[in-house]
Design a protein with these regions (language model features):
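N-terminal signal-anchor transmembrane helix
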Residues: 1-12
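Thiol-/selenol-based redox modules, centered on thioredoxin-like
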Residues: 111-165
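Structural microenvironment flanking redox-active thiols in thiol-disulfide oxidoreductases
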Residues: 38-98
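Sec/Tat-exported extracytoplasmic proteins
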Residues: 20, 45-49, 78, 99-102, ...
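Structural micro-motif
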Residues: 85, 96, 102-108, 118-124
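Soluble periplasmic/extracytoplasmic beta-strand elements of cell-envelope proteins
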Residues: 21-24, 57-60, 122-125, 135
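Short active-site neighborhood of thiol/selenol oxidoreductases, capturing the structured segment around
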Residues: 11-41, 56-57
């Protein structure tokens, strides 16, 4: 992948090679699940900020509206640490393709719906080798819900992966 972050810097998969990272999909004007997800990603950023093995990656699903300037303002408002967390924008079809094919974050639908909006509450944990290790409900820090992993479990899994290396 190759996208542009909140600072206008090109971000590629090379920037995440050998890193544990958490990916999600959002847009800055979302009024439903995104504000809570972003707050929870800020919570996660605070927990992992001293771990050099871990990064965060948020993809805008409305890249035409979420320009570099918009992402920069949003990042500043939310307290994003630039070295830890990239908010990226780019070609919408590329973002939706990576969401579906690389992160598997949406249910498969009809081919004509391929580029409909990707809107999911999932945080995706990717290990140092680029393998998906789990999907976690980005709206749930610590509630126990059947068949669902919460963000406390995500943090435990990040710590486990950090110790393995």
């Amino acid at each position: 992948f190759a996208f542009t972050n909140q600072n206008g810097k090109k971000v590629t998969n090379k920037d995440y090679e050998g890193k544990i990272y958490v990916a999600d999909f959002f847009f800055t004007t979302c009024q439903t699940i995104c504000p809570k997800m972003t707050d929870n990603m800020v919570w996660l950023q605070d927990k992992i900020k001293d771990n050099p093995k871990v990064k965060l990656l948020s993809h805008s699903v409305f890249p035409d509206e979420d320009t570099v300037e918009v992402l920069k303002k949003y990042a500043k408002e939310k307290g994003v640490i630039d070295e830890k967390w990239n908010l990226v924008t780019g070609n919408q079809n590329d973002i939706y393709k990576i969401a579906r094919q690389s992160y598997l974050v949406v249910k498969t639908g009809k081919p004509e719906e391929m580029y409909d909006m990707v809107h999911t509450e999932n945080f995706v944990l990717v290990d140092q080798k680029g393998r998906i290790r789990g999907f976690y409900n980005g709206l749930n820090i610590d509630k126990n819900v059947k068949d669902e992993k919460n963000l406390t479990q995500l943090l435990e899994d990040i710590e486990f992966l950090s110790e393995k290396d």
